[in-house]
């Protein structure tokens, strides 16, 4: 059995790490490189960096900090933000990133997933899915351009359908960003994760809602996700990564202990 992964997420805007609640009202957390170094030292299995306004601004992720991060950490990291071409991806990977993640650009051009997978291999290609539960319809819908609340829009895709589509096109991993839960720290949306797990045959990463160590355990035990991504509980030092992993190990979760 592969070890489960603990993945701090660093949302980047204007060269700094920020964090919002339900993808709104972002506050500045700090500088990118020191945070990345801290999480690596605490025992994170990998890091994810989202340049949250790149796609809505029509630009690619700011590459200047990617190489600086690569110099100070020795764990894998993934970069996302406005990657719309093979050239964009090649540059980011050449600066030291291990994976690239696409979200809004994949919705705009689904063939991008296949072209990237064919060029760089599926192991490098992560598809992020921003999913919102509509209480009126009882359905989960994929959203686009969520880094800028003035441009965020609901797409025609229901979440489960898009999960299946991106796998057909070559996604090697899926990060499910559950917008309703984001930043509120009351637990992952286990019901949604279970539904996605049934149709997801590549590694699945849960994102949005972690507030306690038990929330991580529930995601691994009840929804069988491969990794759990979180931000605010790590940024605000509510949970220490090393202590979290020790707790998960005592609960029978296969996890890499530092």
Swiss-Prot record:
It catalyses: 5-[(5-phospho-1-deoxy-D-ribulos-1-ylimino)methylamino]-1-(5-phospho-beta-D-ribosyl)imidazole-4-carboxamide + L-glutamine = D-erythro-1-(imidazol-4-yl)glycerol 3-phosphate + 5-amino-1-(5-phospho-beta-D-ribosyl)imidazole-4-carboxamide + L-glutamate + H(+). The keyword Disulfide bond does not apply. One of its GO terms (biological process) is L-histidine biosynthetic process. The keyword Cell cycle does not apply. Pathway: Amino-acid biosynthesis; L-histidine biosynthesis; L-histidine from 5-phospho-alpha-D-ribose 1-diphosphate: step 5/9. One of its GO terms (cellular component) is cytoplasm. GO terms for molecular function: imidazoleglycerol-phosphate synthase activity; lyase activity. Keywords: Amino-acid biosynthesis, Cytoplasm, Histidine biosynthesis, Lyase. The active site is at 11, 130. It is an enzyme of class 4 (lyase). Its EC number is 4.3.2.10. Signal peptide: none annotated. Disulfide bonds: none annotated. It is found in: Cytoplasm. Heterodimer of HisH and HisF. PANTHER family: IMIDAZOLE GLYCEROL PHOSPHATE SYNTHASE HISHF, IMIDAZOLE GLYCEROL PHOSPHATE SYNTHASE SUBUNIT HISF/H IGP SYNTHASE SUBUNIT HISF/H. IGPS catalyzes the conversion of PRFAR and glutamine to IGP, AICAR and glutamate. The HisF subunit catalyzes the cyclization activity that produces IGP and AICAR from PRFAR using the ammonia provided by the HisH subunit. Belongs to the HisA/HisF family. This is Imidazole glycerol phosphate synthase subunit HisF. It comes from Escherichia coli (strain ATCC 8739 / DSM 1576 / NBRC 3972 / NCIMB 8545 / WDCM 00012 / Crooks). The lineage of its organism: Bacteria, Pseudomonadati, Pseudomonadota, Gammaproteobacteria, Enterobacterales.
